Amino acid sequence: MALLLAASPANAGPAGCEGGAYQAFDFWLGRWEVRTADGTLAGHNEIIREHAGCLLVEHWQSATGGAGSSLNFYNPVDDRWRQVWVSPGSNIDIGGGLRDGSMVLEGFITYLEAAERYPFRGTWTPLDDGRVRQFFEESRESGVWKPWFDGFYSRSESRPESRAGAAGAAPD
């Protein structure tokens, strides 16, 4: 009886999130130095894959001391990627998917102290030279989008594919 239970599909481990849409944002994985268009250091970012490839976790440290993190995941039910960002000053909740080779996510930014919320969108574009451009916009006036952040990611160290719990990952 115990042998039958151990082999049943209900007791099998999770299949993980591999292939296709689950890997559409993999170009963002890695350790990065982030600079603005004029070359000013904006900060450092690390994006890792966790939980059998089902989650991308971002850890941001700005050059001025600010920090934040995001959880990024693909939902196959609505065929959309979602990012939930949390920092001491703001929360961002955006969703979408690949559009012409770029990851485009749209939703809202909430400024915590002011308790204000505005439409927000982010576009991540892999560039031919191996960098990634991250361009954020916000709309405080109906239909008028203004740049919020424009950063260029350059790899700073080896690319971490995953941590423990990811498909094929070795324990830490």
What is each PLM-predicted segment?
Residues M1-A6:
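Bacterial N-terminal signal peptides
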Residues A12-D172:
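Hydrophobic small-molecule pocket/channel-lining residues, especially in calycin-type beta-barrels
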Residues S8-A10:
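Intrinsic disorder/low-complexity segments in short proteins, especially the signal peptide
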